Amino acid sequence: MLQPPKVLLLYAHPESQDSVANRVLLQPVQQLEHVTVHDLYAHYPDFFIDIHHEQQLLRDHQVIVFQHPLYTYSCPALLKEWLDRVLARGFANGVGGHALTGKHWRSVITTGEQEGTYRIGGYNRYPMEDILRPFELTAAMCHMHWINPMIIYWARRQKPETLASHAQAYVQWLQSPLTRGL
């Protein structure tokens, strides 16, 4: 039987203790041997990122999952700092920057709004695909394959059984991330 590719799950939530949805998503994932869950806020509460360590983690994994809440139409501050520092020129992009070539990027995002608010003319003015375009472009800049994101809309208001269903789908995808869509 083929082994699944190694997955690095970069989790970034500054108030993780208050996020029921993210806890429900993460709990079953931690049982998967081929998945490394790396909580950025737990590792770097002072925002001093060990760039070489993070780059080695990226080298050691084939699939990179960025799990975070949508904050101000982007990601939490520490993840933005991580992206800017770790995906450095010469490592992930630019001259000689091919360390991530051929790897896969997937964003797993929780939002505080309903799906219908993310559309042209809606409360948030733009569809989620447009809001996430900077992440897709970053993946492309790093020569990575973009996998369609998993988005849990209105996360804090989801029923427990709905969150459990999302968590089950997440685990199923992680068990075979390069052959399953979501």
UniProtKB/Swiss-Prot annotation:
Top-level EC class: oxidoreductase
Keyword Membrane part of the UniProt annotation: yes
Keywords for this protein: Cell inner membrane, Cell membrane, Membrane, NAD, Oxidoreductase
GO biological process, one term: potassium ion transport
Record has Cell membrane as a keyword: yes
GO cellular component labels: plasma membrane
Membrane disposition: Peripheral membrane protein
Reactions listed under catalytic activity: a quinone + NADH + H(+) = a quinol + NAD(+); a quinone + NADPH + H(+) = a quinol + NADP(+)
Signal peptide extent: none
Cellular compartments annotated: Cell inner membrane
Superkingdom classification of source: Bacteria
InterPro entries registered for this protein in UniProt: Flavodoxin_fold, Flavoprotein-like_sf, K_H_efflux_KefG, KefG/KefF
Task performed by this protein: Regulatory subunit of a potassium efflux system that confers protection against electrophiles. Required for full activity of KefB.
HAMAP family membership: K_H_efflux_KefG
Protein name listed in UniProt: Glutathione-regulated potassium-efflux system ancillary protein KefG
Organism of derivation: Yersinia pestis (strain Pestoides F)
